[in-house]
């Protein structure tokens, strides 16, 4: 499928998002128990061919009256209750995998706290779920989501080890552009590394170019795929091509209209 064919892919337009922090605790609980959550698949486009090679699944939440919640703030609320966080993450992963519309990469975000609520062994329910789809048409890649503290740097490495031992590929996000879990070991262990285009924009042009050039060159030498996120203009797409990035992602490419609601 050609990523630029707007007759095949249509943009999803959302109304203004609601901050979950404005809701009562019983309203947040009702969203979880009533399964008012779903998934949006965001295309990942190969730079040279302009073709979709996979999708990244994004969580979506709704209130009882069908208002859209800010997903990031919703997860922040769920972090206050580890059991609810674990439950929602596991149910979302089941949904995101089962409703995947095609083949190729399926990148799933997985929070470190959610993952370790399931234990630090190969019996972790997330690992068991991913193993069920090891031979499916989609290639699961888990994007390790950290909370940016020193403890997470160590837990991230352990999470990567467990994912690899269970046969699941790993993606690392925002490499080299903000403080996080970057380490040589993590860099070498990843199958995919993602760069945040918005963070790169915050750098001056020469710094952004030098950062991306160094990281892309290193990734190419060790066989790691690269994705530049936050691509919203043709100029940014052309820049990614010149810099040798393998794939891009962002609002330039309309999201596929596959959005699952459980009501």
Regions found by a protein language model. Name each.
Residues 1-36, 47-51, 61-64, 147-149, ...:
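EAL-family c-di-GMP phosphodiesterase catalytic domain
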Residues 85-155:
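Catalytic core of bacterial c-di-GMP phosphodiesterases, primarily the EAL and HD-GYP domains
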Residues 75-85:
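Short histidine-centered catalytic/ligand-binding loop motif
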Residues 40-75:
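A short, well-structured catalytic beta-strand-centered motif of the EAL phosphodiesterase domain
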Residues 38, 54, 105-109, 139-143, ...:
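Structural preference for beta-strand elements that scaffold enzyme active sites
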């Amino acid at each position: 499928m050609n990523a630029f064919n707007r007759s095949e892919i249509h943009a999803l337009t959302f109304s203004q998002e609601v901050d979950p922090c404005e809701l009562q605790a019983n309203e947040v609980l009702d969203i979880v128990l009533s399964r008012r959550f779903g998934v949006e698949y965001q295309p990942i486009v190969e730079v040279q061919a302009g073709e979709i090679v996979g999708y990244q699944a994004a969580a979506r939440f709704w209130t009882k009256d069908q208002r859209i919640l800010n997903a990031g703030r919703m997860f922040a609320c769920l972090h206050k209750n580890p059991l609810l966080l674990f439950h929602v993450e596991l149910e979302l992963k089941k949904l995101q995998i089962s409703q995947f519309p095609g083949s190729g990469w399926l990148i799933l975000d997985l929070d470190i706290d959610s993952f370790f609520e399931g234990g630090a062994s190969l019996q972790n329910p997330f690992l068991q779920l991913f193993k069920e789809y090891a031979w499916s048409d989609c290639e699961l890649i888990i994007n390790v989501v950290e909370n940016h503290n020193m403890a997470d740097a160590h837990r991230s490495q352990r999470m990567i080890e467990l994912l690899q031992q269970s046969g699941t590929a790993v993606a690392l996000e925002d490499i080299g552009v903000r403080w996080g879990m970057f380490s040589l070991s993590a860099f070498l262990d990843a199958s995919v590394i993602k760069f945040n285009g918005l963070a790169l924009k915050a750098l001056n042009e020469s710094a952004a170019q030098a950062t991306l050039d160094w990281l892309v060159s290193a990734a190419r030498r060790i066989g790691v795929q690269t994705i530049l996120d936050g691509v919203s203009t043709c100029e940014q797409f052309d820049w990614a091509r010149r810099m040798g990035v393998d794939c891009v992602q962002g609002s330039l490419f309309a999201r596929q209209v596959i959005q699952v609601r459980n009501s």
